[in-house]
């Protein structure tokens, strides 16, 4: 069924089909249809971050930026859902066209620029949803907020989403907001992490529960830079790391239509780079905080590959666009077949 739906959706522009897909998935959720149309994955419970996941395969941030289809995605069999990236104030993002399919490579290039309706809209959608599974909320800074003041935007969002999130992801790795990736390095990273940690502790006292913080990083760092990030996360007492966001590289899409568009590349071409980052992090962290792997999972075996590399959980986005909900079950089955899970 998804093959037919994809053929129809792919006749539309990428962003139009994205918006229509969110509407359809959301409507299916409200009517309770999605669970009837999608085979439920096998149960593969895992405990990470003090949270109980029915399976380790989640939806990556970016697909449902505003939380408009939480119930719909929740009925497809995901072990957890991450919505956003959301910013303190609504913003339109970059000019269109800004989203490009590269079907020959099972890839997508985007330069969306954190387009979203703002954190207050997202929270209204979260509170209206019936979904009671693990929900991550991914936060970022507004385009017109200077990088030097970025921490203010992150703290505004953290304050607002804390009570409604199972965990919060801090996005410092999108390539489509100028200067954002500089927050992954040196004193900028340390200052951001310290501010987040202090606010997390204050919010935990206020709300009576500690909501884990994850940092989402880029795949384009050197091994040495990744090691420094890992050390900073441990030192600051962060709870998890998500590896990775999209890449600025173009390996695997050279010469393809739209292959030279500006923006972040996701899908199959980023798989090896992302998995390598997971391996480096796993070696540096030594189990001190969990890794959530994202990037290039277009087959079940790719999800198992991420877990074998050291991840505790995985997330899918581009693979879901190309393969549909069947990828969730395929990924769960592949992870279940790993020796260490038997």
Curated annotation (Swiss-Prot):
Its EC number is 1.3.5.2. Its cofactor is FMN. It is found in: Cell membrane. Pathway: Pyrimidine metabolism; UMP biosynthesis via de novo pathway; orotate from (S)-dihydroorotate (quinone route): step 1/1. The keyword Membrane applies. Pfam families: DHO_dh (PF01180). Catalyzes the conversion of dihydroorotate to orotate with quinone as electron acceptor. This is Dihydroorotate dehydrogenase (quinone). It comes from Pseudomonas aeruginosa (strain ATCC 15692 / DSM 22644 / CIP 104116 / JCM 14847 / LMG 12228 / 1C / PRS 101 / PAO1).
């Amino acid at each position: 069924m998804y093959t037919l739906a994809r053929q129809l959706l792919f006749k539309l522009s990428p962003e139009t089909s994205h918006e229509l897909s969110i509407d359809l998935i959301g409507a299916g959720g409200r009517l309770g249809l999605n669970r009837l149309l999608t085979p439920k994955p096998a149960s593969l419970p895992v405990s990470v971050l003090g949270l109980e996941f029915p399976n380790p395969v989640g939806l990556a941030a970016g697909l449902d930026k505003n939380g408009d289809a939480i119930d719909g995605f929740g009925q497809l069999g995901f072990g957890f859902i991450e919505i956003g990236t959301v910013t303190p104030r609504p913003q339109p993002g970059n000019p269109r066209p800004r989203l490009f399919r590269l079907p020959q490579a099972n890839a997508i290039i985007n330069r969306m620029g954190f387009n979203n309706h703002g954190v207050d809209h997202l929270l209204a959608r979260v509170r209206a949803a019936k979904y009671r599974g693990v929900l991550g909320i991914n936060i970022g800074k507004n385009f017109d907020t200077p990088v030097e003041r970025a921490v203010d935007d992150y703290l505004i969002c953290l304050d607002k989403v804390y009570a409604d999130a199972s965990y919060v992801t801090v996005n410092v790795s999108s390539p489509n907001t100028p200067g954002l990736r500089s927050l992954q390095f040196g004193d900028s990273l340390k200052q951001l992490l310290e501010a987040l940690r202090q606010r997390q502790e204050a919010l935990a006292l206020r709300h009576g529960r500690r909501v884990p913080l994850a940092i989402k990083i880029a795949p384009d760092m050197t091994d040495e830079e990744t090691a420094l990030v890992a050390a900073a996360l441990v030192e600051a007492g962060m709870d998890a790391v998500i590896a990775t966001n999209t890449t600025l590289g173009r390996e695997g899409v050279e010469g393809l239509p739209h292959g030279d568009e500006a923006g972040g590349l996701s899908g199959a071409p980023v798989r090896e780079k992302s998995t390598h980052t997971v391996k480096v992090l796993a070696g540096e962290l030594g189990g001190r905080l969990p890794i959530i792997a994202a990037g290039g999972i277009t087959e079940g075996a790719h999800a198992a590959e991420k877990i074998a590399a050291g991840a505790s959980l995985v997330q899918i986005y581009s693979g879901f666009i190309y393969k549909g909900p069947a990828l969730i079950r395929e990924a769960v089955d592949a992870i279940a077949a790993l020796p260490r899970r038997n």
